[in-house]
Swiss-Prot record:
Domain of life: Bacteria
Species this chain originates from: Leptospira biflexa serovar Patoc (strain Patoc 1 / ATCC 23582 / Paris)
PANTHER family referenced in this protein's UniProt entry, alphabetically: DNA MISMATCH REPAIR PROTEIN MLH, PMS, MUTL, DNA MISMATCH REPAIR PROTEIN MLH1
InterPro entries, per the entry: DNA_mismatch_repair_CS (IPR014762), DNA_mismatch_repair_MutL (IPR020667), DNA_mismatch_S5_2-like (IPR013507), HATPase_C_sf (IPR036890), MutL/Mlh/PMS (IPR002099), MutL/Mlh/Pms-like (IPR038973), MutL_C (IPR014790), MutL_C_dimsub (IPR042120)
Organism lineage string: Bacteria, Pseudomonadati, Spirochaetota, Spirochaetia, Leptospirales
Function: This protein is involved in the repair of mismatches in DNA. It is required for dam-dependent methyl-directed DNA mismatch repair. May act as a 'molecular matchmaker', a protein that promotes the formation of a stable complex between two or more DNA-binding proteins in an ATP-dependent manner without itself being part of a final effector complex.
Gene3D superfamilies associated with the record: 3.30.230.10, Histidine kinase-like ATPase, C-terminal domain, MutL, C-terminal domain, dimerisation subdomain, MutL, C-terminal domain, regulatory subdomain
Entry keyword set: DNA damage, DNA repair
PROSITE patterns listed in its UniProt record: DNA_MISMATCH_REPAIR_1 (PS00058)
Annotated GO MF terms: ATP binding; ATP hydrolysis activity; ATP-dependent DNA damage sensor activity; mismatched DNA binding
One Pfam entry name: HATPase_c_3
Protein's name according to its UniProt entry: DNA mismatch repair protein MutL
GO CC, one annotated term: mismatch repair complex
Length: 614
């Protein structure tokens, strides 16, 4: 007797549900896509118990006719395609006719729908994939789909889901991402009876800010790139604003949210050294492509797509991002590109332009672009009182600060009264900066090359950590509180951890919706850096749960990274002297807080060996 047999239709649907329905968030995706395809101008979503108890998605789209309602839950029944040619020219999100059939096989399903020109709407009740009742109801335009008792007949599926809070977070992320991709549609999302967010039809930038916070407004750069009828549009963040994970990166192909396997590599190449190690830019990027150029039928959940020419897409992406970085951060971008890809010209003799306090001149053909509203950061300028400043100018030209208020005329040897000298690095004199990044200095034991950013980062890290451990800082009340604009759930999560911020001298207060007020900040955070430092710290909180000792360490790293001199910043001779002297008093002057080297040493013997003198 044969052992191979055909599966029942019910079992086939349940198996298919395992491919299409990964979790409750994948159900939300399928239902919202149906609403978008139906031409909805507003979509409302409600979930209870992470969607396992109840899911309701309603829209004002064109609806489903009485004749089509029973077919809507049949597998491979669809209004989207009829021929293979249609599959190659899709204008809709859905096309397989699998979603409702799969959902109906593992839940109790109710569909209500009304279409234009009818006096009554229709209602069908479905259990285990079969229609158990049909009736007419009062008319409304659009469709409502209610799902209850998800996976009631496949309990093993429930067992492998995350915790309820984990599933709720994934649901929020899914709905927000889909709302991000459709700014011309209004969205409202309610979770366990509480409104999570509500957005009206708006422009793409406003949709990004509505969902991910007004705090992004001043840090986003518009991207636009076109080639052969293909367009890239959207926004990326300025290099001074980033996250500690890729959770702020979103990519859409013809408004469909997708995972692009090459996106991380392209972003890394484009930003390069403009970002510190472990930092990831925000990206909200949309590809508008000819339908025949994209194959969306390559993944069960349509998470991935295939392009006719991936090289073309990566080229458009690279061109769009590099162009906006070149024009928005020209000094930093120019230096990074030259270090990465251009040969350094040979000079037979050194002059002031190469090794003096003004920095090395790197001018050349093809780089004669200007800068709108942003000047090259200069460390060591004179303020109104005539004191040297150790802080880069901001976009508005804000003055910086001095390193612990030490002026150029300070007797640096007196610092030893308050600091322990470790004698690992004792500079005698310096010879300026090369490549606007590396300081050349001489000590008794050799020639040192010092990275101005990582060196200053080490200094600031140890100073802030020392202040935190000894409680030597003061918290300063702000006359005008600083507003943090976040999503509602982010604001709630942040306020729930306000005791951690309080331990660091930061006072946070909930205001309304997703707004948080910063009432007090510690003296060790530089003026103008409060928002980005606190948000950076919050990103670190979310990725781990630091104890008090680690809390101080994370805060010191955040402040050091944000306040340190950057690559490309011009540094005056007095400030170089301060920097080197301060570095010599550090407990570990050879490494930055993230483990990167701050300096390398060439001994006299090393040099003589290189020149074959010994």
């Amino acid at each position: 007797m044969g052992i191979i047999h055909s599966l029942s239709p019910d079992l086939i649907n349940q198996i298919a549900a395992g491919e299409v329905i990964e979790s409750t968030h994948s159900i939300l995706k399928e239902l919202i896509e149906n609403s978008i395809d139906a031409g909805a101008s507003k979509i409302e979503i409600a979930t209870e118990s992470a969607g396992l108890g109840r899911i309701l998605v309603s829209d004002d789209g064109h609806g489903i006719t009485k004749e089509d309602l029973p077919l809507a839950i049949k597998r491979y029944a669809t209004s989207k395609i009829q021929t293979f040619h249609d599959l190659e020219h899709l204008f809709t999100f859905g096309f397989r006719g699998e979603a409702l059939a799969s959902i109906a096989s593992v839940s109790r399903l109710v569909i209500e729908s009304g279409t234009e020109g009818n006096r009554m709407a229709q209602r069908v009740v479905v259990e285990e994939g079969k229609v158990v009742s049909e009736e007419e109801i009062p008319f409304f335009q659009g469709t409502k789909i209610e799902i209850k008792d998800l996976f009631y007949n496949t309990p093993v599926r429930r067992k492998f889901l995350k915790t309820e809070s984990g599933e709720e977070k994934k649901n929020r992320t899914r709905v927000q991402t889909m709302a991000l991709g459709e700014p011309s549609i209004g969205f409202r999302y309610v979770q366990n009876g509480k409104e999570v967010f509500h957005v009206q039809k708006e422009e793409p930038l406003e949709r990004v800010l509505s969902i991910y916070g007004e705090n992004l407004r001043d840090h986003l750069l518009p991207v636009h790139s076109s080639r052969n009828g293909m367009t890239l549009r959207g926004f990326i963040s300025h290099p001074d604003f980033y996250k500690s994970s890729r959770m702020g990166q979103f990519f859409f192909v013809n408004n469909r949210s997708v995972e692009l396997k090459f996106s991380a590599q392209i972003l890394k190449r484009c930003y390069g050294e403009l970002l510190p190690s472990g930092a990831f830019p925000y990206a909200f990027l949309f590809f508008d492509l000819p339908r025949e150029f994209v194959d969306v039928n390559v993944h069960p959940q349509k998470k991935e797509v295939r392009f006719l020419s991936e090289e073309t897409i990566t080229g458009i992406l690279f061109q769009g991002i590099t162009e906006v970085l070149r024009t928005s951060t020209p000094v930093e971008f120019l230096e990074m590109r030259r270090r990465l890809s251009m040969p350094i010209p040979y000079h037979s003799s050194a002059d002031k332009s190469q090794f003096g306090g003004e920095g090395m001149s790197m001018g050349g053909p093809g780089f004669g672009f200007g800068m709108a509203g942003r000047g090259q950061a200069v460390w060591g300028s004179q303020n109104e009182e005539g004191n040297p400043l150790l802080g880069p100018s901001s976009i508005e030209g804000r003055a910086g600060f001095s390193l612990d208020g030490i002026g150029a005329g300070t007797n640096l040897h007196l610092l030893g009264d308050n600091l322990t000298k470790h004698n690992l690095f004792v500079p005698k004199k310096h010879y300026g900066v090369i490549f606007e990044t590396f300081i050349l200095a001489e000590a008794e034991d050799g020639l040192y090359i010092i990275d101005q950013h990582t060196a200053h980062e080490r200094i600031r890290y140890e100073e802030v950590l020392r202040d935190l451990k000894s409680k030597a800082y003061k918290s300063q009340s702000l006359l005008t509180p600083i507003r943090l604009e976040l999503t509602k759930e982010e604001a709630e999560e942040m306020i729930a951890e306000k005791h951690r911020f309080s331990e660091l001298g930061i006072t946070l207060e909930p205001f309304s919706g997703g707004t948080i007020l910063i009432r007090e900040v510690p003296s060790y955070i530089d003026p103008g850096k409060e928002t980005e430092t606190i948000l950076d710290l919050w990103e670190r909180f979310k990725s781990k749960d630091p104890e008090e000792k680690e809390l101080y360490d994370e805060m010191a790293k955040c402040v050091a990274c944000r306040s340190a001199i950057k690559k490309g910043d011009q540094v005056s001779d007095p400030i170089i002297g301060e920097l080197l002297q301060r570095l010599s008093y550090c407990e570990n002057p050879s490494l930055c807080p993230h483990g990167r080297p701050t300096l390398i040493k060439l001994t006299r013997k090393d040099l003589e060996t290189m020149f074959h003198r010994i």
